[in-house]
Amino acid sequence: MVRLREIPRTATFAWSPGAASPLIATGTRAGAVDADFSNETCLELWDLALGNEDAGAELQPVAKIDTDSGFNDLAWTDSEDNSRGIIAGGLESGSLGLWDADKLLSGASDAVLSKSSKHSGAIKALQFNPRHSSLLATGGAKGELYISDLNDLENPYRLGSSTARADDIECLDWNKKVAHILVTGSSAGFVTVWDVKTRKESLTLNNMGRKAVSAVAWDPTKPTKLVTATPHESDPIINLWDLRNSHAPERTLRGHEAGVLSLSWCNQDPDLLLSSGKDNRTICWNPQTGISYGEFPVVTNWTFQTRWNPRNPNFFATASFDGRISIQTIQNTSTETAKAVADQNQALDGEDFFAKAQSQPQVSSFSLPKAPKWLERPCSSTFGFGGRVVSVNLLEKGGRASKIKITPFEVDEAVGKSTETFESALKEGDLKSICENRITSAATEEEKSDWRVIDALLSDSPRKGLVEYLGFNDQAEDVSEGLAKLGLSKEDEVNGEAAPKESRRPGARKHKRLQSMFDASPDDNFLSDLAASKGAKTNNPFQIFNGEESEADKNITRALLLGDFEKALDHALKEDRMSDAFMIAIVGGQKCIEKAQEHYFSKQTESPNYVRLLASVVGKNLWDVVYNADLSNWKEIMVALCTFADEKDFADLCDALGDRLEEQIRNTGDKAIRKDASLCYLAGSKLEKVVSIWIEEQRENEQAAIETAAEDSSFSIHVRALQSLIEKVTIFRQVTKFEDSERTKDCDWKLSVLYDKYIEYADVVATHGRLQVAQKYLDLVPEKHPEAEIARNRIKLAMRQPTTRAQPATSTARVVSNKPLPQPAAYQPPTTFSAGARAATPTSYAPPAPAANPYAPPAAASNPYAPPVAASNPYAPTAAAANPYAPSAAAPSQSTNPYAPAGGSYAPAAGYQPRQQSFGAPPPSVGGVPPPPRASSQSPATVTTYTTAKNLPAWNDLPEGFAKQPVSRRGTPASSAPISSPFPNQSPAVSQGPPPAGAGPQRTPSVPPPPKGVPPPPRMTSPPSAGQAPPNPLSAVPPPPANPYAAVPQSPSVGSMAPPASIPRGSSPYNAPPTIPPPSNRYAPSPAAQAASPQLQARAPVPPPPQAAASPYAPPPPAQPLAANPYAPSTPPPMQPPLQQVPPPQSAGSRPSTASSVKKASPAPPKYPPGDRSHIPAEARPIFEILSEDMQRVKSRAPSSFKAQVDDAERRLNFLFDHLNNEDLLKPNTVQDMVQLARAIQARDYETARTIHIDIMTNRTDECGNWMVGVKRLISMSKVTP
């Protein structure tokens, strides 16, 4: 419902028939008067320029030609001789004019093709035959009906008798299916069907009462059906006829409040009919069902013509007597802008209304329940999640029934096969064969090297496998052979023969692993092999001291004799006798050995490199080798680590070596070293390091494959590279038994790049239908990874598993128990609920206690999505009407549909029906006290309640869109958004008392719009704070309420006659208001109570109840009769003037007054745009995550009939998320409570959630906004959603 362009003319019009950019021809409307009182008449052409975004809404004509008379109708048809076609005009003078559109556009002087005057009076209607474009039917005054052939304009023929008729032919239409059938409608009420072939009447419809016919239109698909319209004010109806029964219409469409002037039936969709009329409205109907889809923006004067575009029915045009032709579309694309304009206009004060109100016309919005036929597709298909294609095909051509087919689909079958092969090999545990296959099929040396290293790690001795992979196995064999030649490993012989092979000790070749330089011999202590035999005698006697010894020799000898090996070692080292020192150290033990080794290495400054290596091995300081050895010998370093490193240091040493290699890559750019660094990381089980290298290699290999590939798609190449990466990581994790210690972290993961690859791979395999495989890899990603969480839930939904969410980190917020929170006295309902209990005495802080609990939730069968129905005021002293919301006695059980309305919940009850009383009779009063006389120039004051306070979202707010908002009344209508009061037809919040004594009943058929000088109705104000008197409503006249849910203020009416039924719509500023009070608003003060007690305005505001009813969209049930008001005087002064009061200064902590005298400060602009969720702090993120997920669950399962209510709740929740993102409005303790509320909803502990909600709403109202209502509704909707 967007106005695309406007033509500033009061004119009849016709669309161009071509498929090119649409043009409109306009002819000055006969009898219309322009604003400048010009009598100029002309034919003009207008280019809509819909493709030009810079074009203004108001157009300028592209061609113009003057005429001698005004137009009653225009028609435009194709022509073989004229590319743009021919325009025909029926003039008021009776002339028929024909123009060449091409020549009009070019400005040629001979644009007029013909001008004939066969008609004796004005031509009222004309139309070209849709199948034979050369045939033109014209009808006019005195019943004249001519058929003209453009090929022979001089000889038209007349249908019917030549005798003059008293009625005029007002409209006509060719049958869309049968070319020679024509229908006409006359001012006398005759609807005649003509057979042009026989030139006779075929049928006359029995138009009951012979009411004038203003418009006729044939059904575009059924040749026997047509619609007619009547222009009468008293009975503006549209009749749908079937020629097979001409005695009575098949259906009657009612909705216009004044005569209907024009009809247009869409050629592309027979379910769309436009009508316009004297009530300034254009309505869209479904003529097949009689349902009104809605109305388009109301203008300021009669809409006398409306037409669909014949080529593109997305557009239509409507002409009105306000001097404009509006070109509109049926698709609304700017609802937010329209709402903003409407809200701005609605909030204007009465004094400055005409100075500040915008000139935009009314905004109206509605949605078609189904797509128009030209947007429907006979077949469609879409890719579904999980490797599925969903296709829809019609069961039969021309029908609407469709068949849905779901078929599996794989983008690349090789991906699915390779995934299945790899997963099956994993299940069998045959990792060796996987590695061998990948080594064989590897495309690059780096890939092959990685798999060989992984294969080496699979061996029984991973370090030995790595040594062999590095090529050091042969060198160990060579050393072994060299040592054998020296006799160091020669085995003892038994009886001159070599000992059996199996008898060789395991330490014989222990040097291969070089565990210790002193452990190469099988004899751990060769001195122990010397026999200590008593009778051992030798032929080689010696002297301990022979007199030639040096002093050092003597000292060493004495130390040895005393067994002081350490002192002997010191003397040997002092004399630099290294050989003797080592021998003494061997006898002296480990401490002496280490001392000898240290002294030895300190002396070897110019020794070979192997001595430093030996020093590192002996000193268990392999870090010296890792950090200081030249990287050209990285393999030797790696072998040394595999041979000598302790188990606890091995991984870190390999990691350090890999880091040195990576640093060299960055310094030199030599990417060939990457595989060396990769080996180091693999040996050290450093997955986070090796994954980065693998991902870089994957990217390069993928790019190279894409450049050289001839047939494979880039997707297939990418998926294969991703598959290879995932396989390497998976095998490596199993080989090293890798445990991810960061799965419980919230952020800053070392393996974040791997997690991204897991998520991508899961999406790929899920697309190929392997959902279980996708779930397996997503389970390797931390639970709090945002993308993985979405992907996991998506897969679980596809597998029909319950979606779960990881609990956020434990907050320090207090845990709210299930018991209700203590409530202050002002919000406590009475504790006595017995039906027979005496009404409690009211206090100064609470309203009178009802005998029955007015806030008790209805039975479980109540509908949480049901729209509310207005009920009587529970605070009125009169007895409340029957509760229309209470479930019937036979309420459905819990197992029934939770969305089904309860029995009788939609049946009109006494509280909903208008009061039926005699015309002019006074309404019943309370206690026989007559109301005070009504002032003649000022509206009575209204009692402000919590629900009518300005800018305060009330606890019982309802979803938007249930009814229309009041429209500001002025010369040019203000924009009016499609949001309206939730209490349609409610009573005006003014006294409806009888006239003063002595004044008899007066009959007033309607109340005209108030003149400019009359003050508007009083503004709804906020409830005054405790101890604060409300502002005098008569001292300052406020504008209408800005609260979209407030009651509609109206002037008091006199009569009580029921208005005629009409379709829902926004009130027009040019229509008179209703003449009777609509059904009352249950939350508005009763007229009698208000009139009877002037002091009532000084009472404290009525607080919201501590607990809402079970229905999130319905107000609580009405209460029982209340106790008498202790503040009301027994006999109010009937003529007491209102007191002139000024609101006193507010006390600390009181709610700021929102009276009309106080200007509301404009809020500061938000830090971040609406919809942004990236700045929600971590402590508040559970609110967003849990409530969003639950809202989506409710949204996906709620019935479509409640879409508006669900969407409204979601919109209100987005307000909360915006506040959280901007970190405004909500204080930290409220955020903590909301986290607890969200977790209660997640755990389906709705009582706790409701208790927290009431606590926040009651004690922290300054932090509550529109979002609070959305939370309340989500709690109720979630509770009943399975």
UniProtKB/Swiss-Prot annotation:
WD repeat boundaries on the chain: 7-47, 66-109, 118-158, 164-204, 208-251, 255-295, 298-338, 382-407
Q: Name one GO cellular component term.
A: endoplasmic reticulum membrane
Q: How does it sit in the membrane?
A: Peripheral membrane protein
Compositional bias (Low complexity) spans?
973-992, 1084-1100, 1152-1162
Record's compositionally biased regions (Polar residues): 801-815
UniProt KW keywords: Cytoplasmic vesicle, Endoplasmic reticulum, ER-Golgi transport, Membrane, Protein transport, Repeat, Transport, WD repeat
Write the signal peptide boundaries.
Answer: none
| InterPro entries, A to Z | SEC31-like, SRA1/Sec31, WD40/YVTN_repeat-like_dom_sf, WD40_repeat_dom_sf, WD40_rpt
* Ranges of compositional bias, category Basic and acidic residues: 491-505
Region feature (Disordered): 491-511, 801-845, 906-1176
What processes does the entry annotate via GO biological process terms?
COPII-coated vesicle cargo loading; endoplasmic reticulum organization; protein transport
The compartments listed are: Cytoplasmic vesicle, COPII-coated vesicle membrane; Endoplasmic reticulum membrane
**Which SMART domains does the protein's record reference?**
WD40
Renumbered to this chain, the Pro residues biased-composition regions fall at 921-934, 1006-1021, 1030-1043, 1071-1080, 1101-1120, 1129-1146
Q: Which domain of life is it from?
A: Eukaryota
The GO molecular function terms of this record are: structural molecule activity
What role does this protein play? Component of the coat protein complex II (COPII) which promotes the formation of transport vesicles from the endoplasmic reticulum (ER). The coat has two main functions, the physical deformation of the endoplasmic reticulum membrane into vesicles and the selection of cargo molecules.
Subunit text: The COPII coat is composed of at least 5 proteins: the sec23/24 complex, the sec13/31 complex, and the protein sar1. sec13 and sec31 make a 2:2 tetramer that forms the edge element of the COPII outer coat. The tetramer self-assembles in multiple copies to form the complete polyhedral cage. Interacts (via WD 8) with sec13.
Task: Identify its protein family.
Answer: Belongs to the WD repeat SEC31 family.
User: How is this protein named in the record?
Assistant: Protein transport protein sec31
Query: What phylogenetic lineage does the species belong to?
Result: Eukaryota, Fungi, Dikarya, Ascomycota, Pezizomycotina
Q: Which gene encodes it?
A: sec31
